Amino acid sequence: MKTENEMNSSGQKNPATGNGTRKPNFRHKNYRYKAQPKKEGTKNSTEKPAKNPNHRPQLRSQAKPVIKRPRKNTNGSKLKIIPLGGLEQIGMNITAFEYEDSIVVVDCGLSFPEDDMLGIDLVIPDVTYLKENISKVKGFVITHGHEDHIGALPYVLKEVNAPIYSTKLTLALISNKLKEHNLTKTTKLKEVKHGQVINLGDFAIEFIKTNHSIQDASALAIYSPVGIVVHTGDFKVDYTPVFGDAIDLQRFAEIGRKGVLAVMCDSTNAERPGFTMSERTVGHVFDNLFNEYKTARIIIATFASNVDRVQQIINTAYRFGRKVAVEGRSMVNVITTAAELGYLRIPDQTLIEIDQVKNYPDEKVVLITTGSQGESMAALS
């Protein structure tokens, strides 16, 4: 299946930066940041409130979701799992699940062309099968907001229009794409919370909290008349995430005890020994770098969608008294959306426009930019 950190370890390009896009205008209203005013009596917005040592948090999975069970398979019909992209390749993740007259599509991503595909900017999946069975398609269920999982939606929806179900941040990123293609009026977006179950035709689908290099990532428990399929989406096990809760391993265990027909699991870099470090560990690295280069301008390239990493850069810059400027169209779009939804907390007077950088000495500025993989059209390039 798909990648971790938007294809970072595979060496593939990052589709989030786009190709041939115009440099963003921070003076435009869509590219301005407005930090929320700090309430009286509260700590700085970048700091989490102190935990009560006597408080014992309740596990999420104690409140088990109510699942409307699909009807039993009494006629010998089979569940079809149809990969339309994303297997044995990086990117273009899309899988159809079909039972009788119901089809549910999980993810709808794009990929970059091979070296011999001259003149091609993006590659989208072949959805001929969905077009031929369009009356069966009940909806698109999206695991998270990376381009290789949502990037093809504006193109596929023009051929196969169905409601889209996902979590809050993922839907917001999808909505931004649909606006660019004038599809917002013709596409239904349905927000789903972790732990919630939706019913689509012969399927019931449960969203399970996971961690990834983008917030609001989900795994799916797909209940069908013939059994349960677990689709992990892209994930990592992070017990100390920067934002939100850790992966809900307890819920995976509960579903496993019920009996699972199949598991479709992210396997990117599974052949490598070791494990993926917590995102908080990267925050400690920033502290060391800012201490080491106190008199220099700091430029940090990262994936636009890695909101947790951007948050830690902003937190570190604030502690060291530096202003933060952002460059790169996708970076601006994601930061704006994440800040509006409350996934990114930005102190007042911290962000500046890119053309204001020249007004500050080097030791007072940090630049966050796209282009961490050397993409030809990214801001860093």
Question: How would you describe each model-predicted region?
Answer:
Residues 368-369:
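Short beta-strand segments
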Residues 363-365:
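Short, surface-exposed beta-edge/turn micro-motifs
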Residues 1-75:
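Intrinsically disordered, low-complexity RNA-associated tracts
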Residues 54-141, 146-360, 372-381:
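His/Asp/Glu-rich metal-coordinating catalytic cores
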